[in-house]
Amino acid sequence: MNSQTALQYVKESGVVAGMRGAFPPDVALQVSAVMMGEGINCFEFMMNSEAPIEAMQAVKAEYGDDACVGMGTVLDVATAERVLDAGADFIVSPAFQPDVVKAVLARDVLMGPGVATPSEAVHAWNMGVRLLKLFPIGALGIDYFKAMF
């Protein structure tokens, strides 16, 4: 799935279901089946161990292009490349790291870097990023979000 298609999935779904933890593939398939049944077809696994890669691959194999399946908490280029090689449709990071952004965009995959300032947001946008993660939104608050955008 290319970056434009993945972005369209995210826009149309309106929700990206985040799956944090060391989900074994069978549990990830059970959770994603419930979500798919409710019309949620975008899933973000969190890269906090090796288990999320296997879970992501299982969900991707089960649903193919009927779901948009990606990985969050990607912190460096080496991890981004491993996740991309495993078939991620998108990557999200809690930080704006230009080297990670370049590596992901070079493979025409949707990238959502974390941004906390207008300068980071504009820099990411000028690099070709079309999905931004305002992070940490909980600490910054909705008023900060409104003022920024």
Q: Where does each model-flagged region fall?
A:
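Alpha/beta catalytic cores of nucleotide-metabolism and tRNA/nucleoside-modifying enzymes
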Residues: 1, 116-130
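Conserved N-terminal beta1-alpha1 strand-loop-helix module at the mouth
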Residues: 1-86, 106
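Short acidic/polar active-site loop segments enriched in Thr and Asp
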Residues: 41, 89, 130
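Short acidic active-site motifs
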Residues: 55, 78-79, 99-100, 119-121, ...
